Amino acid sequence: LVGSEMCIRDRFLDVTGRNDWSSTLAPGNNSYFYPSVSGSVILSDLLHIDTPMVNFLKVRASWANVGNDTSPYQLLNYYNNSSFTGGFNMPTNKANYNLKPENVESWEFGVEGRFFDSRLTFDVAFYNATTTNQIISVPVDITTGVYNTIVNAGEINNRGWEVSARIQPVRNKNIRWDM
């Protein structure tokens, strides 16, 4: 894992890179590199906003690309132990020596704020993640002698909003009420 962080006048940048080697994937497909970059700006400091109404305001963005490998023993066909002593069963899944790592590319944009002496806070973010080269089991014709094979197929996208808010209607030396 290699990373670097930089902060210049209320602007933050974080860059990382990581490479993994997986023993569950074949040589040539077993190494995957995943980088990420994120940045944020504290607008309330940058714009010198120092009022009782606005205490803190930050915008942020990030992008990452990560890999995923498969379960062990998916690359080669092997016999399974039988329920009978000393026996073996034929495999029910056809192995795939050419499996590649899954890939997930994601990004997020967000805003965080605190207002009225931090009595009202919020955090809103939009995220988007796309997974490609999913490692999935697909059915095959039974005449092949197996039921399934493991392949890289499919693409799925997951996106949405994350919202959190807190209000503190009562705060004094004896009581603090958060909602």
What label would you give each PLM region?
Residues 4-5, 9-179:
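Extracellular/periplasmic, surface-exposed regions of secreted and cell-surface proteins
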